[in-house]
């Protein structure tokens, strides 16, 4: 595997497509509430715990297989993670949870140039999600990629606050962010502060990639992820999600 990418519009050569097998909704905790269910009570979230239905998993896997087949037809080399049990318990000295899924590799890996970053995802249940991709990562490393993992965080309860849902519920106590909080624009990295990424995440990213400019965006959207809000299609053309971005709050890097 050869790794090099600085944007999302160049021709695609290789890609990882996830899996839906054994997807599991973990027990509620502040990190899960922050990312998915900030407006629900813990009692309401508890009703969701457990495996996704066979129907959902089967249909999701069929979609992923169809996507993989189509990409291969177009000449793209496709990699798939291992199937793993996501209901296995994860225990630390401070909390316990289960896994979630390995459906979305774009959530947990950020490619910047020749580097692959295992990001410090905002959910406790994703702390070991990258393990199912280990064989792929070793192949990338053998091909010359720089592979490193962000510092493992403690995911303290104090890292999340739900007093004001009009603001990000992720606090700035630890280095936490998901890869889709970053929109890659060549040597500029547009970083969204939201429920899925805080300012310390941006500071850490800038310290690791001093040759790039990390541009922090606060105002566009406080929910999870930025790549469904701002989509650069090519140089000079960007697609905005009109439900989240307006002429008053769009990222100023896109001003003419």
Model regions: which residues?
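The feature marks the mature, well-folded catalytic cores of soluble enzymes
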Residues: 1-256
């Amino acid at each position: 595997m050869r790794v090099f990418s600085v944007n999302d519009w160049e021709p695609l050569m290789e890609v990882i497509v996830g899996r839906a097998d054994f997807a599991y909704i973990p027990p509620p905790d502040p990190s899960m509430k922050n990312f998915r269910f900030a407006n629900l009570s813990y009692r309401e979230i508890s009703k969701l715990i457990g495996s996704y239905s066979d129907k959902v998993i089967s249909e999701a896997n069929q979609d992923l297989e169809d996507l993989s087949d189509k990409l291969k037809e177009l000449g793209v080399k496709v990699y798939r993670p291992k199937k793993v049990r996501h209901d296995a318990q994860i225990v630390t000295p401070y909390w316990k949870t289960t896994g979630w899924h390995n459906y979305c590799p774009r959530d947990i890996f950020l490619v910047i140039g020749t580097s692959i970053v295992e990001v410090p995802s905002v959910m406790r249940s994703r702390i070991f999600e990258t393990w199912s991709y280990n064989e792929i990562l070793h192949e990338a490393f053998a091909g010359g990629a720089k592979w490193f993992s962000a510092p493992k965080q403690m995911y303290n309860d104090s890292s999340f606050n739900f007093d004001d849902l009009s603001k990000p519920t992720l606090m700035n106590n630890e280095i936490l962010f998901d890869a889709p909080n970053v929109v890659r624009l060549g040597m500029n990295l547009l970083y969204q502060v939201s429920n899925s990424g805080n300012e310390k995440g941006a500071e850490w990213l800038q310290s690791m990639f001093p040759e790039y400019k990390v541009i922090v965006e606060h105002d566009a959207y406080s929910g999870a992820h930025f790549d469904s809000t701002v989509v650069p299609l090519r140089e000079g053309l960007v697609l905005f999600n009109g439900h989240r971005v307006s002429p008053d709050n769009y990222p100023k890097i896109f001003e003419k």
